[in-house]
Structure formats: C-alpha cells, structure tokens
C-alpha cells in the first residue's frame, strides 16, 4: 500500500499492475530522453550567438522532426493498446462479485452464492484500533481467493462513483443504470486498500475499499460461515 512521501506507484500485486508499471517506466524513459534533448538544445541556443545558416531552411531537418515524433508515438501507443486489450479480456472467472456504490458506502453481493451480501462502511476515526489506518478501514472487508480470476460487476444506485484499488491496477466507474465489469487476480495474500475515485458528494473521501486476499481453503471456510 502507499506510504508517506511516496514518489512512485504502489507495489504491483496483480499481473495487470505489473504490466502497467513496466509501461510507466517505458514511457517515462522516452519522456526523460526527449526532455533532456530539448533542454540541451535550449541551453546551446542561450549560450552561443552562432547560427547555422544551412539549417534555416533545410528540408532534411523538417523531415526528421516529422518522422521521429511519429515513431516515438508508435513506441508509446503499441504497449498501451496491448495493456488495454489485456484489461478488457475476461476468461472463465472463478468467482463473480457485484458491487454497488451508494452515498457514501459500498455494498457487495457474491452472485455465486444464494445469500452472501453485505454493506461496507468506513470505520470512524474514534473507533479505530491500534494499527488500523485512518479513512481506510471498513467494518466488512471483501474476502476473495488469491491466484484465481475474480470478475467484479460494478454499478451505482445514486450518483457517479469509481471503484479503485491501485495495487491491483483497478479503476472502474460505477454509473447508475449501467453495469461495468473488470477482473482481478492477486498473486499474494494480504490487505489491499482503495477508495472511491470519483467526486460523489460531501462524504466522497469516506468511501474506502478493503480487499482481503486469502488462500482458497480459507475463503471456502469464510463463505460457509457467512452463508
């Protein structure tokens, strides 16, 4: 999860987030090289009064600075399109969970079970226990099996919300009257925190999301108790 004064992205927990981290580094490297070149040229122009008259109207130079940016954009676009298609791909999910956004809490329904649903509210600051995180803890966590494909169906009952868990590379809008879907797969157990990422009213900041990724055997025990 995030920590104070963090500069980079959160550690990846899912294959999609790992791909996003690689794409981020790839794009940042290209941007850094371009910025360095531009700053170098500007510094040369500011520190010398010499002018190359042969480059004032050179077709070759114009050709280069037209083709080169096109190549750079292609190098950025191709990996981006690949990841976009990966994020939309859904192959035989092992479990489906429906989440509904409300002002200002989330409700969850495990559609593969007959009667397994609950609401998830933020725990107020004055009720937190030692070691719990302010504005991020909830009274009912979403327990999911790790190393399995889980499909999330996301919608809203009132206004626009957005269901986001950064360490899993997830951010899907919750739109009234529309059912969006995304998939997740965590590669290791743990607690993963997120928040509503769409301004939805006065208590927008108080809609945390907590996913508890556990081994399949523990999940089966938990679901049997909950049902």
Swiss-Prot record:
Keywords: Copper, Electron transport, Magnesium, Membrane, Metal-binding, Mitochondrion, Mitochondrion inner membrane, Phosphoprotein, Respiratory chain, Translocase, Transmembrane, Transmembrane helix, Transport. Binds a dinuclear copper A center per subunit. The chain crosses the membrane at residues 15-45, 60-87. It comes from the Eukaryota. It catalyses: 4 Fe(II)-[cytochrome c] + O2 + 8 H(+)(in) = 4 Fe(III)-[cytochrome c] + 2 H2O + 4 H(+)(out). Its main location: mitochondrion. Belongs to the cytochrome c oxidase subunit 2 family. Component of the cytochrome c oxidase (complex IV, CIV), a multisubunit enzyme composed of 14 subunits. The complex is composed of a catalytic core of 3 subunits MT-CO1, MT-CO2 and MT-CO3, encoded in the mitochondrial DNA, and 11 supernumerary subunits COX4I, COX5A, COX5B, COX6A, COX6B, COX6C, COX7A, COX7B, COX7C, COX8 and NDUFA4, which are encoded in the nuclear genome. This is Cytochrome c oxidase subunit 2.
């Amino acid at each position: 999860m995030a920590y104070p004064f963090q500069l980079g992205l959160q550690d990846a927990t899912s294959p999609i987030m790992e791909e996003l981290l690689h794409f981020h580094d790839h794009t940042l490297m290209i941007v850094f090289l371009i910025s360095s070149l531009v700053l170098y040229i500007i510094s040369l122009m500011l520190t010398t009064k010499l002018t190359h008259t042969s480059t004032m109207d050179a077709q070759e130079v114009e050709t280069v600075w037209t083709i080169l940016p096109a190549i750079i954009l292609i190098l950025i676009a191709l990996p981006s399109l690949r990841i976009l298609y990966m994020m939309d791909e859904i192959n035989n999910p092992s479990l489906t969970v429906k989440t509904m956004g409300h002002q200002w809490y989330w409700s969850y329904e495990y559609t593969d079970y007959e009667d397994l649903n609950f609401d998830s509210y933020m725990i107020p600051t004055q009720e937190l226990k030692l070691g719990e995180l302010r504005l991020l803890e909830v009274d009912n966590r979403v327990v999911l099996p790790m190393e399995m494909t889980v499909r999330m169906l996301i919608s809203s009952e009132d206004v626009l919300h957005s269901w986001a868990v950064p360490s899993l590379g997830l951010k899907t809008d919750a739109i009234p009257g529309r059912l969006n879907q995304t998939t997740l797969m965590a590669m290791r157990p743990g607690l993963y925190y997120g928040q509503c990422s769409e301004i939805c009213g006065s208590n927008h900041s108080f809609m945390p999301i907590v996913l508890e990724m556990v081994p399949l055997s523990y999940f089966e025990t938990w679901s049997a108790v909950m049902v």
